[in-house]
Design a protein with these regions (language model features):
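Structured, beta-strand-rich domain cores
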Residues: 60-108
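Polar, enzyme-active/binding microenvironments
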Residues: 17-26, 30, 106-116, 156
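Solvent-exposed edge beta-strands and adjacent loop segments
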Residues: 1-77, 121-138
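Viral virion structural and adsorption modules
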Residues: 1-3, 149-158
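Short intrinsically disordered coil segments
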Residues: 90-95, 139-141, 156-158
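Short beta-strand and beta-hairpin "edge-sheet" elements
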Residues: 103-154
Length: 158
């Protein structure tokens, strides 16, 4: 697959049970809740904290560093809905779920074996309504701290 836009090519699923985060099964993923349609276009941020460790010495003029810790939270911007409000009602304080992100295939494409996905073990904060503004839809912010190392190169199993 060549280069592709994000629009219409990301799928976000909240999954209750994943036995192996390196190889979530099609059945596990399909048992989850597909939330992509409840997120704003800019509404998904995956953990990007990358810390470095200084290893330079006083004898050197170069500030040497090596990789250190990494992590963070999955941050999402949800869209309020005056009918079902599915995502708002789903997210509760301390809810544990796997946030599964698939990039590339069209959003509506069913999960299939051999697809690459990212799997983030997360616990959610209470969703918080965003500040109001004119000519905007009603939004809310979701923070889901990732509590153990995610698998960014998982492959869907049959």
């Amino acid at each position: 697959m060549g280069k592709y836009p994000n629009d219409g090519r990301i799928r976000v699923q909240l999954v209750a049970v994943v036995a192996n985060i390196a190889a979530p099964t099609v059945a596990e993923l399909n048992a989850g809740t597909h939330i992509t349609g409840f997120l704003s276009k800019d509404g998904l941020t995956t953990p990007a904290d990358q810390n470095n460790v200084d290893v330079g010495t006083l004898a050197e003029t170069f500030n040497a560093q090596v990789p250190g810790t990494f992590g963070g939270a999955v941050e999402m911007t949800g869209l309020k809905d005056d009918v079902a409000d599915t995502l708002w009602n789903l997210i509760t304080y301390d809810l544990g779920r796997y946030v599964v992100v698939r990039r590339g295939p069209p959003t509506a494409t069913a999960y299939a074996a051999a697809q690459p996905v990212e799997v983030y073990p997360a616990r959610f904060h209470e969703p918080v309504p965003d500040q109001t503004g004119g000519d905007e839809v009603s939004r809310f912010t979701i923070s889901a701290p990732v509590y153990s190392q995610p698998n960014l190169k998982a492959i869907v199993a049959a």
